[in-house]
Amino acid sequence: MKPILPLALLLAACSQQPAEPTLTTGVFAGKGSGDRLCIAGEPGNYRGGLIVFGDGDVNCSASGRIEVADATLALVPRGEGECRIPLSIDGGAIRIGQVPAACSYYCGPGATLSGNAFSLASQAQTRDGSPAKAVDLAGDPLC
């Protein structure tokens, strides 16, 4: 009878793990006309991408997986070991926190990710009236 008690306690402890939060997926628009963030996938397998423009066509752009740990989110660019772009959900907006120096590779001179905010762009359209999309400078999808 004694071996059953530790097994029961172990199973009870495992069942109390918090589930990964469900994120709203789709395209989010930033303050600039081309600033976009996208989230796709499902819990445990989210991916994301973003592009933020500075002056002219100078920009920051990255895509990869969305890492969820405790109450924090981060975009981890593909092939990256050190860069974690911190994200937070603030009501209906997604905000980028203070981006570490390890992520500077993803920005051109004068462009920055830190402090940008994005709102769900379900009805947002581009200048020519087409639906908003999250694409890089070459037109390739970020998600």
Enumerate the language-model features and the residues they cover.
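Sec-dependent signal peptide recognition
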Residues: 1-8
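Bacterial signal peptide processing site
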Residues: 15-17
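C-terminal motif of bacterial Sec signal peptides marking the signal peptidase cleavage site
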Residues: 11-13
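N-terminal glycine/threonine-rich, aromatic-flanked beta-hairpin/loop signature
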Residues: 36-69, 142
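Surface-exposed, polar helix/loop patches in the mature regions of secreted/periplasmic/lumenal proteins
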Residues: 81-129
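Short, hydrophobic/aromatic-rich segments at coil-to-beta transitions
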Residues: 20-29, 44-49, 68-76
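Contiguous, well-ordered beta-strand patches that form the walls/edges
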Residues: 54-100
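Tryptophan-anchored aromatic micro-motifs
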Residues: 20-37, 117-127, 131-142
